[in-house]
């Protein structure tokens, strides 16, 4: 596996990895004003993994939201509809529109508003590549011998109102008898024979039936051979399904999943279900997926050191997405943004304030990487775009972080818990959440939500101040705090004219550190603070409670945009973004490393080697840039036939003792056998 391929899975910072994942989250229904609402699915599907084949029948009960003459559903382009019938078993025509992966079914007699009917679809196809995926180049539905997965996002059954239309379902999956199927809802298993139409052998099969009787977003299925681990600790019915290669870490992931699930219960109350299946996915799909009672993690994401952040995000979706869901695309942050910040809160619980600070930095970078459209207007963006996903996830998470600062800890926690309880099993809007927050705050919060949802941009704070000596005894002895010894008068400035937020000021003195909450309004906000010790340094927002456009955030945002472009194959544009980062910090090891990656992909090995050396000699942030630069230099020397120099680089990589992303295993591998450049595809 080349370093670029790793970049997609493991070498990105968490925010970048998350962004790569988010780029490929599929679209909602093309028409925001959905003309129909699916109420229930009855699906029978037969999987033939060796042939990558599926045959299915889906009964779809739906209700017209307005007078309806044509029923439109999304369906994977590799699936061919062979027959559509109505409730009287009368055949109907069906038009396939490949441009938007839809099936259009004219209704001969129409359907009046609020009336319901059921259509039965018979369809089949092979799912073995990502060529016709709803997201080109990424598998969201795949059938194969080792592991088969059919995600709701993959449109393997007729879908309407993706992510907003809550539904119930009964899904029966017929597979070879040696396979296990994981899904959502109450499960029953029976020994059956595959339907004759689909049978190509006499091998025994089993049918797994999942009944999801609480409306949500079931429909994601994983089938394969797994080792199962169980836990009923804290009343949680947890099942972990990992491949044999990860059996050694399964107990640690089991323990962490229990801890995260119970932590979220203390914050938000009980979820829709206290059952959870954690299942390993192949490495050719999303880093993780979620569905009712299910979290899937791709194999490369299951690391020896428990990947508790990614796991926490998936588990948090059992509240935000499964239980409470967005009413529209403009409300999408109520799912992904809430899950993102729930993850950050667990990080704080597990790793302390330093862990939260790192998570907030990641969210800040994502929030400002594509801050060109207000979050409240996210529906105007293409949902396949990084802009949309950056807004709903990272800016959404940062809005909660800032609201926590405005409300205070107790009122914020009460707001989150009440929102989770009041809208459990329902779709919610941003206004629904704002009303609960205002009730607990005791005052209107229009200014806050308008500023962060209806506007773009973020402040960059600057402070200037003057210190005056007072006549208090503390001026002579900072430890004598009978009276203040110094007065600091100053001004906080920033560029946003309509900006309003409380901001924390920290004054480091010869004595104790002083903190003061200052209301910043407009471009210039004066303050006066009296201290006992002589002020030595004043910091604005030292704990990163407010989304700010600092130079570090600008640098990391440029790198994040570059990585997204690199994953899309636009290396020239990626290089431009990485160079923007260098303009902000010529010594940035991460920027040099990313530039080296681009040159490596272009097979410009001399320029790549130069950039890797610059990364090694840079600021060393993050630390892993050194070990991976050494490994990459070794690969370059192997490619150019300089084995002795290559071995020396691998040896220096081992000497760092930094095993980030499995670096030491990689170095040992190429110490034993020279790296060979992959052949270019025709």
Predicted regions mapped to residue ranges:
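Zinc-dependent metallopeptidase catalytic helix centered on the HExxH motif
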Residues: 294-358, 416-417
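A surface-exposed beta-strand-loop module
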Residues: 78-139, 195-203, 207, 522-534
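Beta-strand-rich binding/interaction modules
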Residues: 81-85, 182, 445-446, 459-540
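N-terminal, polar/Ser/Thr-rich
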Residues: 23-55, 63, 82, 139-143, ...
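Hydrophobic helix-coil surface modules that form long, contiguous segments used
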Residues: 56, 160-312, 341-344, 536
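Glycine/proline-rich low-complexity spacer/linker segments in large multi-domain proteins
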Residues: 113, 123-169, 547-567, 576
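Amphipathic alpha-helical substructures
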Residues: 66, 272, 382, 389-484, ...
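Acidic/His/Gly-enriched intrinsically disordered linker/tail segments
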Residues: 213, 287, 332, 336-407, ...
């Amino acid at each position: 596996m080349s370093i670029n391929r790793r970049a997609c899975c493991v070498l990105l910072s968490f925010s970048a990895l998350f962004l790569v994942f988010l780029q490929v989250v599929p679209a909602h229904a093309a028409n925001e004003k959905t003309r129909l609402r699916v109420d229930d699915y009855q699906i029978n599907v037969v999987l033939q993994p060796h042939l990558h084949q599926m045959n299915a029948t889906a009964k779809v009960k739906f209700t017209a939201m307005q007078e309806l003459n044509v029923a439109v559903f999304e369906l994977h382009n590799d699936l061919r509809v062979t027959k559509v019938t109505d409730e009287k078993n009368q055949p109907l025509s069906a038009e396939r529109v490949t441009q938007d992966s839809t099936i259009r079914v004219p209704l001969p007699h129409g359907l009046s508003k609020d009336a319901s009917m059921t259509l039965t679809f018979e369809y089949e196809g092979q799912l073995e590549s990502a060529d016709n995926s709803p997201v080109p180049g990424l598998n969201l539905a795949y059938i194969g011998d080792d592991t088969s997965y059919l995600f709701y996002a993959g449109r393997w059954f007729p879908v309407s109102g993706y992510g907003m239309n809550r539904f119930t379902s009964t899904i029966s999956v017929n597979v070879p008898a040696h396979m296990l199927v994981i899904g959502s809802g109450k499960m029953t298993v029976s020994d059956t024979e595959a339907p004759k139409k689909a049978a190509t052998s006499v091998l025994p099969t089993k049918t797994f039936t999942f009944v999801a009787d609480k409306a949500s977003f079931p429909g994601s299925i994983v089938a394969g051979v797994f080792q199962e681990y169980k836990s009923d600790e804290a009343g949680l019915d947890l099942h972990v399904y990992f491949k044999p290669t990860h059996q050694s870490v399964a107990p640690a992931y089991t323990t962490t999943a229990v801890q995260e699930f119970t932590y979220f219960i203390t914050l938000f109350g009980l979820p829709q279900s206290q059952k959870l299946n954690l299942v390993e996915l192949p490495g050719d799909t999303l880093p993780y997926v979620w569905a009712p009672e299910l979290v899937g993690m791709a194999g490369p994401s299951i690391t020896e050191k428990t990947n508790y952040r990614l796991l926490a995000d998936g588990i948090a979706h059992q509240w935000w997405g499964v239980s409470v869901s967005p009413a529209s695309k403009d409300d999408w942050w109520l799912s992904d943004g809430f899950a993102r910040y729930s993850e950050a809160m667990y990080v704080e619980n597990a790793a302390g304030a330093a862990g939260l600070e790192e998570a907030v930095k990641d969210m800040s970078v994502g929030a400002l990487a594509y801050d060109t459209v207000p979050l409240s207007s996210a529906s105007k963006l293409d949902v396949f775009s990084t802009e949309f996903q950056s807004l709903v996830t990272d800016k959404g998470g940062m809005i909660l972080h800032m609201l926590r600062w405005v409300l205070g800890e107790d009122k914020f926690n009460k707001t989150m818990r009440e929102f989770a309880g009041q809208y459990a099993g329902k779709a919610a809007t941003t206004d629904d959440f704002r009303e609960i927050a205002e009730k607990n705050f005791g005052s209107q919060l229009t200014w806050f939500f308008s500023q962060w949802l209806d506007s773009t941009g973020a402040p960059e704070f600057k402070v200037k101040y003057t210190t005056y000596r007072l006549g208090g005894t503390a001026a002579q002895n900072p430890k004598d705090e009978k009276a203040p010894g110094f007065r600091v008068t100053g001004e906080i400035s920033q560029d946003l004219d309509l900006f309003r937020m409380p901001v924390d000021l920290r004054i480091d003195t010869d004595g104790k550190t002083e903190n003061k909450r200052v209301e910043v309004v407009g471009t210039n906000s004066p303050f006066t603070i009296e201290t006992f010790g002589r002020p030595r340094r004043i910091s604005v927002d030292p704990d990163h409670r407010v989304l700010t456009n600092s130079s570090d955030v600008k640098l990391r945002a440029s790198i994040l945009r570059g990585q997204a472009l690199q994953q899309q194959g636009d290396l020239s544009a990626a290089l431009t973004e990485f160079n923007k980062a260098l303009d902000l910090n010529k010594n940035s090891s991460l920027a040099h490393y990313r530039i080296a990656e681009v040159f490596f992909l272009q097979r410009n090995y001399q320029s790549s080697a130069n950039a890797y050396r610059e990364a090694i000699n840079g600021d060393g942030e993050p630390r892993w840039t050194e070990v991976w630069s050494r490994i990459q230099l070794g690969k370059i020397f192997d490619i150019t036939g300089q084995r002795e120099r290559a071995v020396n680089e691998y040896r220096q990589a081992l000497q760092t003792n930094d095993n980030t992303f499995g670096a030491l295993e990689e170095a040992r591998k190429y110490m034993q056998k020279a790296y060979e450049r992959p052949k270019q595809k025709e």
